[in-house]
């Protein structure tokens, strides 16, 4: 499972011009599900993201998590995060999970994040073409892969 996490002042996602999820200050999580991901990857990644101390404390140090700041989390599925560009110029998406595997893991990730936040995470629509709008804060952008745990 691979995620691009962006600290945002605000973010929203729309499908066919209709906003399906929006947050004020918090984290935008672009989430790619790999073909070999398991519920253990979901649990680890959700825990890691919710505990990341990338919000400033009273002294201006990155020392607070999205949970501690009562921020929002917007999760958007994005299989293209699993692209391989090793050969040629056309990306291969063979590492991405097929929709029948990816969708339940995406839903489980949303549930895990919501549980850790103590409120629902906002989301896009799995498999849909979406328009994502965001205002970066920092910018602070991290890439985390559950198969490369550090």
Curated annotation (Swiss-Prot):
Chain positions of motif Gly-cisPro motif, important for rejection of L-amino acids: 138-139
Keyword Transmembrane helix applies: no
Keywords: Cytoplasm, Hydrolase, RNA-binding, tRNA-binding
EC number in record: 3.1.1.96
GO MF, one example: Ser(Gly)-tRNA(Ala) hydrolase activity
Biological processes annotated in GO: D-amino acid catabolic process
Cited PANTHER family: D-AMINOACYL-TRNA DEACYLASE 1, D-TYROSYL-TRNA TYR DEACYLASE
Function: An aminoacyl-tRNA editing enzyme that deacylates mischarged D-aminoacyl-tRNAs. Also deacylates mischarged glycyl-tRNA(Ala), protecting cells against glycine mischarging by AlaRS. Acts via tRNA-based rather than protein-based catalysis; rejects L-amino acids rather than detecting D-amino acids in the active site. By recycling D-aminoacyl-tRNA to D-amino acids and free tRNA molecules, this enzyme counteracts the toxicity associated with the formation of D-aminoacyl-tRNA entities in vivo and helps enforce protein L-homochirality.
Domain comment, as recorded: A Gly-cisPro motif from one monomer fits into the active site of the other monomer to allow specific chiral rejection of L-amino acids.
Quaternary state and interactors: Homodimer.
NCBIfam families to which the protein is assigned, alphabetical: D-aminoacyl-tRNA deacylase (TIGR00256)
The protein, known as: D-aminoacyl-tRNA deacylase
């Amino acid at each position: 499972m691979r995620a691009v996490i962006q600290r945002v002042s605000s973010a929203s996602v729309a499908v066919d011009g209709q906003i399906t999820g929006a947050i004020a200050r918090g984290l935008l999580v672009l989430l790619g599900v790999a073909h070999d991901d398991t519920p253990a990857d979901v649990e680890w990644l959700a825990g890691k993201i919710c505990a990341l101390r990338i919000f400033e404390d009273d002294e201006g140090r990155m020392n607070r998590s999205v949970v501690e700041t009562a921020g929002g989390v917007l999760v958007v599925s994005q299989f293209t995060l699993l692209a391989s560009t090793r050969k040629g110029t056309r990306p291969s998406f063979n590492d991405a999970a097929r929709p029948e595997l990816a969708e339940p893991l995406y839903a489980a990730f949303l549930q895990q994040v919501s549980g850790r936040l103590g409120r629902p995470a906002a989301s896009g629509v799995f498999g849909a073409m979406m328009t994502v709008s965001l205002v970066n804060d920092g910018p602070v952008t991290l890439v985390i892969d559950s198969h490369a745990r550090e």
